Amino acid sequence: MNRLKADQKTKVGKRKQDPPETLSEAEYDVKKCRAQNNANLVGVSNMTSSQTVMPITHLSYASSSSQGLAQSSILSKNCPKNYENILRQFVQWTQATEPVSLNFLAKANWNIEYAMTLYYDNPNLFSSSAPATVDQSKTIQLFTQYVDKRDGLGERIGPHGMQRLLIDLGYEPIDRRVLILAWVFKAETQCEFSLQEFTNGMASLQVDSIQGLKQKIDALDAGMKADLTKTRDLCIFTFNYGKSAASRSLDLEMAICYWDVIFGARKPLMSQWIDFLYGQERMAYARLEEELGPTNAKKVKSVWITRDTWNLFWDFIVLGKEDLSDYDEEGAWPVLIDQFVDHCRENLNYPKPLRENSNAMEHQSYY
């Protein structure tokens, strides 16, 4: 990234002698912005547009066609004074080339969070600005390295191969990045990848190496705090990924495990929620013990997390206030969450809001 700090004093004296450049609209914006910033530094304020468009010698732009850039119809005409830092940060997080990064930032009006969302939603949006760098044969060869006969899954990566993959990536099994990896690859089964899932996932990230894969997954993880939509998408994916194929709901222990993976260190409300669920399980077991006897009662799992509860719990824990003062009792919440709120207000001294002053949930981040 040192090239981004290179000398900004371009050869103004030779400007009229150089042949005219063919610039993309986004490249034109940045060159104009840099020229205007330089002009401000030396006290020049009355330069015309033709005088202020100066070559950028320290950004290694690949030549890009106007056809490729035509995919963006909202390229920004104004870039901030700290645009170099924004561009550098975007390149570092996404590992995208500078021309591609520039186009995404311009399309997002230099809002880096929005630009990253655009990039991960469609990394090939400006693919014509830079050639694809993924080697399919390398990806298949990489997949083959992690197929382990001990798993007995044929041409699939199984638990043994997955363990080696995580070691090479430097991830612990309970690391959220492991779940993000499964989400990006659209994996259907825990601890397994099919060849199609692996190759499609690598292609979507535009990588064909372990190092490249780690950089992209790390960047996605870092961006989760700023992009709650992606965090919710990850959470919704986890329900199907975590439950058994034969079940319609998620086992309580599995649900708690994945909540810890997604949300990290437990905040008080999360801890109280989990304690409440364990309490529900104990009460259910006591009833089953009376009806079926101790031996048979242990064979029955009495508390399950339904899809509705799982999905809406994200809204509850992320978007709601920690004191539950904005909880709408008339809202379409699952019964289990209603019961938890009643428990908090009756047994844990949570405030009981006035109904006439109850407000809709305000946006706030759990993280």
UniProtKB/Swiss-Prot annotation:
It comes from the Eukaryota. The gene is dcn-1. This is Defective in cullin neddylation protein 1. InterPro entries: DCN-prot, DCN1-like_PONY, PONY_dom, UBA-like_sf. Residues 83-120 form the UBA-like domain. GO terms for biological process: astral microtubule organization; establishment of mitotic spindle localization; protein catabolic process; protein neddylation. Coiled coil: none annotated. One of its GO terms (cellular component) is cytoplasm. GO terms for molecular function: cullin family protein binding; ubiquitin binding; ubiquitin conjugating enzyme binding; ubiquitin-like protein binding. Required for neddylation of cullin components of SCF-type E3 ubiquitin ligase complexes. Neddylation of cullins play an essential role in the regulation of SCF-type complexes activity. Does not act by preventing deneddylation, but rather facilitates neddylation, possibly by acting with rbx-1 to recruit the Nedd8-charged E2 enzyme to the cullin component of SCF-type complexes. Keywords: Nucleus, Ubl conjugation pathway. Residues 134-345 form the DCUN1 domain. Residues 1-19 have a biased composition (Basic and acidic residues). Its main location: nucleus. The keyword Nucleus applies. Interacts with the cullin cul-3. Interacts with ubiquitin via its UBA-like domain. Interacts with ned-8/nedd8. It is found in: Nucleus. Residues 1-24 are annotated as: Disordered. It comes from Caenorhabditis briggsae.
